[in-house]
Amino acid sequence: MSAVINKEALLAKIEEALRRGKPRRFRQSVELILVLREVDLSKPENRINLLVELPHPPKPNKVAAFAHGAFEVQAKNAGVDAVISRDQVEGLSGNKRAIRKLAKQYDFFIAPPDLMPLLGRVVGPIFGPRGKMPEVAPPNVDVKSLVERLRRSVRVKLRNEPVIKVRIGAEGQKPEEVLENALAVLEDVNRKFSLRQYLKDVYIKKTMGPPVKAKALEVLAR
């Protein structure tokens, strides 16, 4: 990634964003916003939905498991924050309010393949647009490793607009840690869209803070 991004320039923008804005009564997140150009999002192949593991997550994500049988035992042993049974899923059918509440409660969900058709019918219409559909856990997967990875990950999406917004840190973290998180996101995006070709602008901002803007040429290595 160092061959593509000017780390010193991006770090300076992160430091500026962390300095700016009034103190708040809560710990603000630090957001990375990428504006792309010349990306035809009418083509499905140009849309992205990635999970990026951050080297320095600002806090562990909450992970819930839709599970039954042996997978339920594995999920509990992996330390998930909640286990939702097949019966509970069926009980959610038609209860949009409860499904929306569940989607807000947890950052990520996991499920075995055999539960996915039921989940698609019951929670899919609400979970899908929110990017909350469960990660499928294949039969031989190390469930504990999967849960640990999800606790450290962020979802990077590009769908209807050529803009990517993702949390890369929080107040109280070292700027260098936020930088390494940003580089992890940029590296994965660069695999799909060459940043040298498609990146237009970069913004760094705290939740309630003013955005710090950088043109692509300012943060791309020369």
UniProtKB/Swiss-Prot annotation:
GO molecular function: rRNA binding; structural constituent of ribosome; tRNA binding
Transmembrane segments: none
Known function: Binds directly to 23S rRNA. Probably involved in E site tRNA release. Protein L1 is also a translational repressor protein, it controls the translation of its operon by binding to its mRNA.
Stated family: Belongs to the universal ribosomal protein uL1 family.
Record note on quaternary structure: Part of the 50S ribosomal subunit.
Classification via InterPro entries: Ribosomal_uL1 (IPR002143), Ribosomal_uL1-like (IPR023674), Ribosomal_uL1/biogenesis (IPR028364), Ribosomal_uL1_3-a/b-sand (IPR016095), Ribosomal_uL1_arc (IPR023669), Ribosomal_uL1_CS (IPR023673)
GO biological process: regulation of translation; translation
Record has Ribonucleoprotein as a keyword: yes
Disulfide bridge map: none
HAMAP family associated with the record: Ribosomal_uL1_A (MF_01318_A)
Name of protein: Large ribosomal subunit protein uL1
Record's keyword annotation contains Ubl conjugation: no
